[in-house]
Amino acid sequence: MWNLYFLKLLIDVLNIKVKNFRIIKKMKRKYILKKESEITPVFKSKKRYGNSLFIIYYVKQTAFPHFKFALSVGKKYGKAHERNLIKRRLRAIIRSVSPCLNPKMFFVIVIKAQAKNLTFQQLKTFFLQFATKTRILLSNK
């Protein structure tokens, strides 16, 4: 009972929007490449940049006022819960730097198996360096 009361008080004090005590912080659907018809032109553009952790395929676009992205993790990476964990982490990183991302880009990030051993902070620093080199990240604030 005490924990529930404390949680309600904390939510009220911090003015967090909550639905059934679950914080709503989700990447909006308009920023995600979902359809195959959206993803295949990105791969066919043949503009890519890679390192030991990621490969980013990207294409410039002017039709949308914002960026769109997709994440891809191969089965060699590990079991489903490991693949889902790395995708959740990268989505959180992208969400945190979304105001700084180039709005005229569609990009697909392919995650390699070596990224499995990294912590969240290491993954974030490597991704920010990588995104700055590929000019997907406009300014690192």
UniProtKB/Swiss-Prot annotation:
EC number: 3.1.26.5
Domain of life from the UniProt record: Bacteria
PROSITE patterns for the chain: RIBONUCLEASE_P
InterPro entries: Ribosomal_Su5_D2-typ_SF, Ribsml_uS5_D2-typ_fold_subgr, RNase_P, RNase_P_CS
Gene3D superfamilies reported in the protein's UniProt record: 3.30.230.10
GO CC term, one of those recorded: ribonuclease P complex
SUPFAM superfamilies the record matches: Ribosomal protein S5 domain 2-like (SSF54211)
Keyword Glycosyltransferase in record: no
Reaction catalysed by this enzyme: Endonucleolytic cleavage of RNA, removing 5'-extranucleotides from tRNA precursor
A molecular-function term among this protein's GO annotations: tRNA binding
Keyword Nuclease found: yes
Coiled-coil regions listed: none
Alphabetical keyword list: Endonuclease, Hydrolase, Nuclease, RNA-binding, tRNA processing
Any single GO BP term: tRNA 5'-leader removal
Similarity field: Belongs to the RnpA family.
Record's subunit section: Consists of a catalytic RNA component (M1 or rnpB) and a protein subunit.
Function: RNaseP catalyzes the removal of the 5'-leader sequence from pre-tRNA to produce the mature 5'-terminus. It can also cleave other RNA substrates such as 4.5S RNA. The protein component plays an auxiliary but essential role in vivo by binding to the 5'-leader sequence and broadening the substrate specificity of the ribozyme.
Name this protein carries in UniProt: Ribonuclease P protein component
Source organism (scientific name): Onion yellows phytoplasma (strain OY-M)
Protein encoded by which gene: rnpA
